[in-house]
Amino acid sequence: MEKIEKTLEEWRAMLDPEQFNVCRLSATERPFSGKYNATKTDGVYHCICCNEPLFDSKTKFDSGCGWPSFYAPIGDNAMTEIRDTSHGMIRTEVKCAKCDAHLGHVFPDGPPPTGLRYCINSVCLDLVPRE
């Protein structure tokens, strides 16, 4: 996979302010505010920054946490994981492997078959409905 690299100013020019703050500055959207939190549309969720496929809607579940949750990424190489010790917590941050956009965090409290919960900011995603 070829990495996409842009300056912060280039990202700022192509993203809206909330997308920029979350994807490029690692902010978090307010819980229950994202457009994909409750959607049930069948399709594939892509990175808003680079259009890389990230999650299949078949792995989405209602975790009640206020952000879209998935139990697995679309592929083993779709994202990278980074230890996050911000805000006095120890978590695992997930980023798009192609463009390094901050997506959210992964937690070990999800459903079978993986036991994982990828807690992802809606603003980082673009849902492409399945035809």
UniProtKB/Swiss-Prot annotation:
Protein keywords: Metal-binding, Oxidoreductase, Zinc
Keyword Zinc part of the UniProt annotation: yes
Active-site residues, as the UniProt record annotates them: C119 (nucleophile)
Residues in MsrB domain copies: 8-130
E.C. no: 1.8.4.12
Cofactor: Zn(2+)
Example GO BP: protein repair
Record GO cellular component, one term: cytoplasm
PROSITE patterns registered for this protein in UniProt: MSRB
Highest taxon, organism lineage: Bacteria
Cofactor binding note: Binds 1 zinc ion per subunit. The zinc ion is important for the structural integrity of the protein.
Residues binding Zn(2+): C47, C50, C96, C99
Keyword Metal-binding: yes
InterPro entries in alphabetical order: Met_Sox_Rdtase_MsrB (IPR028427), Met_Sox_Rdtase_MsrB_dom (IPR002579), Mss4-like_sf (IPR011057)
GO molecular function: peptide-methionine (R)-S-oxide reductase activity; zinc ion binding
Catalysed conversion reaction: L-methionyl-[protein] + [thioredoxin]-disulfide + H2O = L-methionyl-(R)-S-oxide-[protein] + [thioredoxin]-dithiol
Similarity section: Belongs to the MsrB Met sulfoxide reductase family.
Name used for this protein in its record: Peptide methionine sulfoxide reductase MsrB
Top-level taxonomy: Bacteria, Pseudomonadati, Pseudomonadota, Gammaproteobacteria, Pseudomonadales
